[in-house]
Amino acid sequence: MAQRQKPMALRPAARILFLPPLNRPSPFNPWLARLLPPPPPGKLTKLTPGSSKILSSAPLVSFPSRLETPQVKYCLIWPSGQGLTPTLPTSQPCTPAGLGTWRFSWSSPAMPLLLARWLLPLYHPIFPRGHSLLPRSHASHMSCVMCAPWSPFNSLFLMCVESFGMLPRIKRNLCAWFACCTRHSAQTARVMSLLWSLAAFFLSRRLISILST
């Protein structure tokens, strides 16, 4: 009887981080210097329209907010495959050829995802658009509130959940559902933000009481 092989962990094809124009002030600028890891070794090259193949294997779930229009985004793309070179931030329009285009600006409530992206570098599968049975790599963690919270308080919530050992058990079941909700409705994202913030408040109080006893 042949032994069943364990499924290999899905690894992202690229790490994608959206940056603002450097001349635009933002309250999150101090976080950039603290959270951005050093660039990987290799030759730095600018992103050109010909490098779209690097983006093609990075599925992103779109967030169709009617209040914001797609803008030219600054992208920092670090391919993880061998033989590929990292990429400098550039003002090229980023249109990933995966599940859709991630739309946001610095005024978007989605900005705290930058904080969670580097504090909680989780890699796990999500179900792509169409509810396919084949999971795809959640490359940039920008489509799910479990990985990319919509409120600064949510990073505290995720830390509390992880400290209680619940994160590995619940993230696989909730991630695809939250990604689906936030993809279809901006209002749903705001509601989820409020719910996660309340959960973060109560979990943080419980964690403090446990540590103080």
From Swiss-Prot:
Induction note: expressed as early as 9 hpi.
GO process terms (BP): symbiont-mediated suppression of host innate immune response
Source superkingdom: Viruses
Keyword match Ubl conjugation: no
Subcellular location: Host mitochondrion
GO cellular component, one term: host cell mitochondrion
Keywords: Host mitochondrion, Host-virus interaction, Inhibition of host innate immune response by virus, Viral immunoevasion
Note: This ORF is not present in other Noroviruses.
Function: Plays a role in antagonizing the host innate immune response.
Protein known as: Virulence factor 1
Organism expressing this protein natively: Norovirus (isolate Mouse/NoV/United States/MNV1/2002/GV) (MNV-1)
